[in-house]
């Protein structure tokens, strides 16, 4: 059943990348993966449900690939970041139309569930970039990490535009190396170790990806904790220590709600939850809200 579901998701992604979401029918997806349309409807009630599953599937693939790169001790932290940037550029080139929909798509074309999921995916990418920068450069960049995230996004956006209109395929290695070299120079020559952006601007930037309008921090915290508990409860007890993870999440929630939460304990608990590798979205958002 899992392989059949994966085949459908890969076929849908291929078609969404070649055309776009609104132009692809369930019948076309069925023909692409050589199944009956009825077989697809047994697994996905609608094209929107299929898209939601595909967004989650893509996100898990991205996180898994990044985790493998992070575990490659043969590479330096800077080389790992370079490879992550290249991987993202390659992914966009392979699935251009699909990522165009996520990045530039008309929100009127999707229902509220799809729009919310697209916002969550964008939020995950933003937090993933933040984490990748910290892993590469260390915690000394924490005071201005969001400045670097915005600069990284600006460079990525323009190079993605070039890839979008390219007539002859661009070499991605030099592009990735240029992006990292530019970040290196910015960090090296920075005159102040503080962010150039006021805190309210940073909050607006973070929240813009995860919601239709900025939400109160306490609301975002509550939503992220709820998602964390839900994610832990869905894990297999055979593969994960669900009881320990549940206890850690409960301790994190209790500490986060204190008037003066202890930073060392928050970092320790988030670090432990992060090690699972499968709770990326809620953990990244909690890290943003509670630590950086």
Swiss-Prot record:
Superkingdom as given in the UniProt entry: Bacteria
The entry's keywords: DNA-binding, Repressor, Transcription, Transcription regulation
PROSITE patterns linked to this entry: HTH_TETR_2
UniProt xrefs under Pfam families: TetR_N
InterPro entries: Homeodomain-like_sf, HTH-type_TetR-like_transc_reg, HTH_TetR
Domain HTH tetR-type span(s) in chain numbering: 2-62
GO molecular function, one term: DNA binding
Residue range(s) of DNA binding per entry: 25-44
Name listed for the protein in its UniProt record: Uncharacterized HTH-type transcriptional regulator YcnC
């Amino acid at each position: 059943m899992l392989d059949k579901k994966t085949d459908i998701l890969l076929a849908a992604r291929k078609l969404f990348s070649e055309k776009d979401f609104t132009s692809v029918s369930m019948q076309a997806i069925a023909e692409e993966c050589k199944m009956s349309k009825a077989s697809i409807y047994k697994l996905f009630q609608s094209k929107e449900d299929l898209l939601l599953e595909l967004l989650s599937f893509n996100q898990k693939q991205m996180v898994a690939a990044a985790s493998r790169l992070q575990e490659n001790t043969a590479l330096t932290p800077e080389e790992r970041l370079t490879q992550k940037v290249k991987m993202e550029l390659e992914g966009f080139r392979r699935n251009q139309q699909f990522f165009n929909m996520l990045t530039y798509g008309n929100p009127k074309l999707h229902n509220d569930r799809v729009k919310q999921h697209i916002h969550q995916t964008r939020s995950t990418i933003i937090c993933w970039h933040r984490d990748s920068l910290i892993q590469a450069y260390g915690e000394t960049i924490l005071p201005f990490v969001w400045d670097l995230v915005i600069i990284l996004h600006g460079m990525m956006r323009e190079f993605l535009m070039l890839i979008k209109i390219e007539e002859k395929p661009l070499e991605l290695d030099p592009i990735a190396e240029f992006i990292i070299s530019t970040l290196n120079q910015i960090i090296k020559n920075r005159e102040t170790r503080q962010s150039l952006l006021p805190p309210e601007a940073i909050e607006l930037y973070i929240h813009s990806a995860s919601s239709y309008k900025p939400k109160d921090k306490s609301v975002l915290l509550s939503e992220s904790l709820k998602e964390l508990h839900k994610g832990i409860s869905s894990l297999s007890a055979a593969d994960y220590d669900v009881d320990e993870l549940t206890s850690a999440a409960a301790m994190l929630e209790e500490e986060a709600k204190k008037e003066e939460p202890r930073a060392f304990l928050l970092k320790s608990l988030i670090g432990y939850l992060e090690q699972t590798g499968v709770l990326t979205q809620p953990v990244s958002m909690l890290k943003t809200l509670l630590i950086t």
